[in-house]
Amino acid sequence: MNSAVPGTTHDDIAALTPARARERFRAGERVATSGWCPGFTQANLIAVPQQYAYDVLLFTQRNPKACPVIDVTDAGSVEPGIAPGADLRTDLPGYRVYEEGRLVAETGDAREHWREDMVAFLIGCSFTFERALLESGVPVRHLTAGTNVPMYRTNRACRPAGRLHGPMVVSMRAVPADQVAAAVQVTSRFPSMHGAPVHVGDPAALGIEDLAWPDYGDAPVLADGDVPVFWACGVTPQAVIAAVGIPYAVSHAPGQMFISDVPEATWALA
């Protein structure tokens, strides 16, 4: 779903502070956040009842490529350390609600779905390193096209943890063949934002049957000479929840991230 304010341009969203962006989402704007507030950290969200929090924490520790945790709330808290004063129930553009592993609701306001004992995990997002890609001369096709990044469930199993198991999800960016090495080099500096790609080239090697039909996000944009490059993705917990049927969870809508106050440089290796 895309309901950006009419007349909003890329320059407008790039100039926003994270706090102002969160205000707009709180007011009901629903949009993919690639290109928003460049220079600041974006994060995936997965929130579960406290009885499942240790399973999720263990899962993220065993699968840091897909689930690099950058913040965890206390049970019942909706204010993350990476954005003091923010409210995780309202300050993302979109949310998904899962019951017994089934998607039961999509909303722009999660307050009525947020239980008192929820523990929220914020997981680094690859949108954070897109500015660095652009600055190095690597095009970001979905950003130019104004679409959401395509994401795919793969045949790569994550390491099980407690009651959790399931497939890795990846995001895909089409990169000119002569710039793949640069894309790998740039993104490897951001291990807390998924780091270097997990695969370059043939989608079938990841069990992806048709690149044109992603499981999440929008259809890919490719130019002549592009190579598909795949990064581990923070939507992985949603695929895991669907696989194991966790009784209850709230997540971000894929591509509609939490924008924090933390500069991207915080996570960049020298």
From Swiss-Prot:
Keywords: Lyase. The keyword Membrane does not apply. It is an enzyme of class 4 (lyase). Pfam families: D-Glu_cyclase. Its EC number is 4.2.1.-. SUPFAM superfamilies: PSTPO5379-like. The keyword Transferase does not apply. It comes from the Bacteria. InterPro entries: D-Glu_cyclase, Putative_hydro-lyase, UPF0317. Disulfide bonds: none annotated. One of its GO terms (molecular function) is lyase activity. NCBIfam families: PRK05463.1. Belongs to the D-glutamate cyclase family. This is Putative hydro-lyase Noca_0093. It comes from Nocardioides sp. (strain ATCC BAA-499 / JS614). The lineage of its organism: Bacteria, Bacillati, Actinomycetota, Actinomycetes, Propionibacteriales.
